[in-house]
Amino acid sequence: MARIAGVNIPTNKRVIIALQYIHGIGPKFAQEITKKVGIPIGRRVHELSDAEVLQIREAIDQGYQVEGDLRREVAMNVKRLMDLGCYRGLRHRRSLPVRGQRTHTNARTRKGPAKAIAGKKK
């Protein structure tokens, strides 16, 4: 099992698919990295030499923000919005949808499980 950016990459998958196990690398970036390093599309991870794995590591370190650094940056961006007190920050603080979705009937994922309300007693 190759270890890239602190993540164990599955050995039996194609390189493009395996790179997507790293947080911050999707299909587009995975294809870009393999082209930059010069690895064929169909090659599997267990077929890579140590030199090729090292080249992939260096390409990711140089050009992409992944894993912990990316998570930290996203968290800092959300914290900055909350500290500013802007509308988006308030929505984050109250755990409500940020991008204008309706909340009257939906948004259960963001708001959490429904709270029981006592009905009218007869």
Swiss-Prot record:
Q: Which Pfam families match?
A: Ribosomal_S13 (PF00416)
Q: Which GO MF terms does the UniProt record name? A: rRNA binding; structural constituent of ribosome; tRNA binding
Q: Which UniProt keywords apply?
A: Ribonucleoprotein, Ribosomal protein, RNA-binding, rRNA-binding, tRNA-binding
Do you know which InterPro entries this protein is assigned to?
A: Rbsml_uS13_C (IPR027437), Ribosomal_uS13 (IPR001892), Ribosomal_uS13-like_H2TH (IPR010979), Ribosomal_uS13_bac-type (IPR019980), Ribosomal_uS13_CS (IPR018269)
Q: Give the range the annotation lists for the signal sequence.
A: none
* GO biological process per UniProt: translation
Region labeled Disordered — which residues? 97-122
Q: Which domain of life is it from?
A: Bacteria
GO cellular component terms listed in the entry, alphabetical order: cytosol; small ribosomal subunit
Quaternary structure annotation from Swiss-Prot or TrEMBL: Part of the 30S ribosomal subunit. Forms a loose heterodimer with protein S19. Forms two bridges to the 50S subunit in the 70S ribosome.
Function in brief: Located at the top of the head of the 30S subunit, it contacts several helices of the 16S rRNA. In the 70S ribosome it contacts the 23S rRNA (bridge B1a) and protein L5 of the 50S subunit (bridge B1b), connecting the 2 subunits; these bridges are implicated in subunit movement. Contacts the tRNAs in the A and P-sites.
Q: Which family does it belong to?
A: Belongs to the universal ribosomal protein uS13 family.
Q: Which NCBIfam families match?
A: uS13_bact (TIGR03631)
What HAMAP family does the database record attribute to this sequence? Ribosomal_uS13
Q: What name has this protein been given in UniProt?
A: Small ribosomal subunit protein uS13
Q: What does UniProt list as this organism's lineage?
A: Bacteria, Pseudomonadati, Pseudomonadota, Alphaproteobacteria, Hyphomicrobiales
